[in-house]
């Protein structure tokens, strides 16, 4: 029986195929949702065309299916949500909660990399300008279900951050908040590399008058050099063969109790066993290398 009161999601960007680090986020969010008898949605965050790889979105969906991670409902494509983002921007403008900024990146770098509110009172128009939120009540900390209370960097928390870019693209923080609210997401399970923008996203929820979801930030998978596995670091794509060895490596990475039975289970049986025995308290907080996957991928 599905618990409609719990809605989780996995929201990859189509900048390349899924790799082991992506699988950690997908699997962790999937197991958390299914262990709560909840809904698990997939959203493709295709709002940054210069970073997108042709065909990557379709490949990602095939990879999820191949690894037994079957989602609920229709895929939400951010490229089809521009009207919703424009409406959100217009509402913030009407409420005097945003302003146009013409400051070049070089100026912000010269003052230390954190924006100082220079354009907040200058009444610029939209031409060749970004849109920034007016940070009246910054969020200085948030509670992570896995990690406890997390303190924000005060300078970043207080910054009037960009919600609409100068090049006309919608900023990630705006789009993710609007879409998570639209999809009714109650808990976000994702990688620890996204801890930093969380307070900004919660502040947007407050500006809109919406309830923020709960958050769980999973440990990051690192390569042998200690860098996060990522598309930018050329992490190898998930293997196309038998998914079970990689799923087992991912489950162990997430601190789940391995049993000898895992090796003999079919993919669906393995995932159902993992759902039935999912334990958040054994998930490690720190990032680590996964040598089993690294060796298998060479």
UniProtKB/Swiss-Prot annotation:
Binds 1 zinc ion per subunit. Keywords: Aminoacyl-tRNA synthetase, ATP-binding, Ligase, Metal-binding, Nucleotide-binding, Zinc. ATP binds at residue 231. The keyword Signal does not apply. The keyword Iron does not apply. InterPro entries: Glu-Q_tRNA(Asp)_Synthase, Glu/Gln-tRNA-synth, Glu/Gln-tRNA-synth_Ib_cat-dom, GluQ/Sye, Rossmann-like_a/b/a_fold. It is an enzyme of class 6 (ligase). Its EC number is 6.1.1.-. GO terms for biological process: glutamyl-tRNA aminoacylation; tRNA modification. A motif ('HIGH' region) lies at residues 12-22. GO terms for molecular function: ATP binding; glutamate-tRNA ligase activity; zinc ion binding. Gene3D superfamilies: HUPs (3.40.50.620). It comes from the Bacteria. L-glutamate binds at residues 9-13, 45, 172, 190. A motif ('KMSKS' region) lies at residues 228-232. Its cofactor is Zn(2+). One of its GO terms (cellular component) is cytosol. Zn(2+) binds at residues 101, 103, 115, 119. PANTHER family: GLUTAMATE--TRNA LIGASE, GLUTAMYL-Q TRNA(ASP) SYNTHETASE. Belongs to the class-I aminoacyl-tRNA synthetase family. GluQ subfamily. Catalyzes the tRNA-independent activation of glutamate in presence of ATP and the subsequent transfer of glutamate onto a tRNA(Asp). Glutamate is transferred on the 2-amino-5-(4,5-dihydroxy-2-cyclopenten-1-yl) moiety of the queuosine in the wobble position of the QUC anticodon. This is Glutamyl-Q tRNA(Asp) synthetase. The lineage of its organism: Bacteria, Pseudomonadati, Pseudomonadota, Gammaproteobacteria, Enterobacterales. The gene is gluQ.
